[in-house]
Amino acid sequence: MIKLRLKRFGKKREASYRIVAMNNLSRRDGRPLEELGYYNPRTDEVRLDVPGIVKRLQQGAQPTDTVRRILQKQNVFEQVSAKPAS
């Protein structure tokens, strides 16, 4: 199963995260299928590849709870329901 989840990077105690599509059995910091965005919890900076995320969600990818909250704040789920599934 493909999951949209956070991949940690950055210095010790100064973590930043990439939002990635990965197999759910892969390591947290393993090689992703696709990088879809960036999240910095220290500054609340979020950058998303919305078309890529919408495509993955329509293909059946499941976001983790944290990624789901980030996507809800950015109104990505509204775009998923607005576009017809291909």
Curated annotation (Swiss-Prot):
Name of the protein in its database record: Small ribosomal subunit protein bS16
GO cellular component: cytoplasm; small ribosomal subunit
GO molecular function annotation: structural constituent of ribosome
GO biological processes: translation
Gene expressing this chain: rpsP
Keywords noted in UniProt: Ribonucleoprotein, Ribosomal protein
PROSITE patterns the UniProt entry points to: RIBOSOMAL_S16
Extent of the signal sequence: none
Family note: Belongs to the bacterial ribosomal protein bS16 family.
